[in-house]
Amino acid sequence: MDDPKLSKSSLVLAALVSAGAHANPIGFDTDKRGALPAGWTAGVTGRGTPKWAVEADGTAPSAPNVLKQSGAGTFPWCVMKGASVEDGFVEVRFKSISGAEDQAGGVVWRWKDGDNYYVARANALENNVSLYYTEKGSRKTIKYVDAPVPGNVWHRLRVEFQGRRIKVLLDGKSYIELEDSHIQGPGALGVWTKADSVTAFDDFHYGSSKAPQK
């Protein structure tokens, strides 16, 4: 049975974040190909040599460019340097292209640094959606749920977060809704992969539930 507290809070959160959304999704279409998007930074939690770059992709939801990770590392990430959100949402379109060990696409929020943040991801090899927190470089599982994630297909991954409440949606369907308090306070937002996942991202979108200061 659904928790009535969580169901009610998710309705309130949806109303709040719609009012504080970033005006337009970030489609990487004005960024230089072969380089990171302007205002973004990349790295890895753990070890490895991730390769993040803007590339052309004829299948992109908002053509012509995508942000693509084609290297390998424990947990590669790429985050915006100019945004800091405590409560709100983060959303992205992603396509899992290949990977022998993993085929993951995810989003991060309340990102303090490369060792401390929340992450939600969908996995085309495992056909599931998972929620984690990372503290001091160690990733810990909060919950995972089976979900259809066919590879080489564009999906929409969205996370709504307000205080302790977290809701994870894939392609418009809610798969995880719970409370957790491991990572608190404002932080950056971005995208994430795992291991040898080759993943493309497009239409990155975020919003804050806090009203802008006048």
Give the location of each predicted region:
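Short, aromatic/His-centered strand-loop micro-motif at the edge of beta-sheets
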Residues: 135-156
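Extracellular carbohydrate-recognition regions
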Residues: 23-44, 213-214
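Ligand-recognition surfaces built from glycine- and aromatic
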Residues: 184-214
